[in-house]
Amino acid sequence: MTKSPEPGALPTLGAFADEDAGSPPSLFPDYRSTTFRSPLQAPLPMAQTLTEVSGPAGCWERLMGAAVADLTRQRAGTPLGQRIVVQGHVLDEHRRPVPHTIIEIWQANAAGRYIHALDDWDAPIDPNFTGAGRVVTDEEGRYRYVTVRPGAYPWGNHRNAWRPAHIHLSLLGPAFATRLVTQMYFPDDPLIEIDPIANAVPMPYRQRMVGRFDIGLCEPNWALGYRFDVVLKGTQATPFQGE
């Protein structure tokens, strides 16, 4: 006989695997580079040690420096492009807030160009935009940052291949091994449907990687607003890149 849950207890979710949340496979032939970097053997489970379960909990800011929540005010001038506000929550499988989560942000500029030396596309570099930021979730699991909408860029996977506009997010938890990486796309971008990286995540899970336009987050006469919640695990989890 199954024991009834205590009043107010959270529901039991049962067995869960990465594929339940649409996590992309390590091998996806349309994404060409996965054909030569995907493991040839099944992954081996490893027991966690002190290295994996410990880390600078509550001390990330002391190690990494102060948060950089406004990417439009890092240099003396103003970056080119459409200013946007991105806000959301980091949640667990029961949609409870996860405070003190570090979120690293990196992206291309409005022309689709990254600032790093290995980006050799001839789109212009914006001297007033680094494309990198970092925020920390508050006690309600909420985060917010200001940036410019990134541009699309070619990436050489196949003829006329273009990556849709996206923002990379890396989430760091209480331990060194608790790093999850995902991307946020934009709801009006036609390139999502033909992008192999995005399409490695099947529908309907792919939709969890698309930010929602939110007029309530828009700053009048200044910036558009998008909402993007991140669920860390469970059947409603945001798809993350493979570990």
Describe every region a protein language model picked out.
Residues 2-243:
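Beta-strand-dominated extracellular/periplasmic modules and repeats
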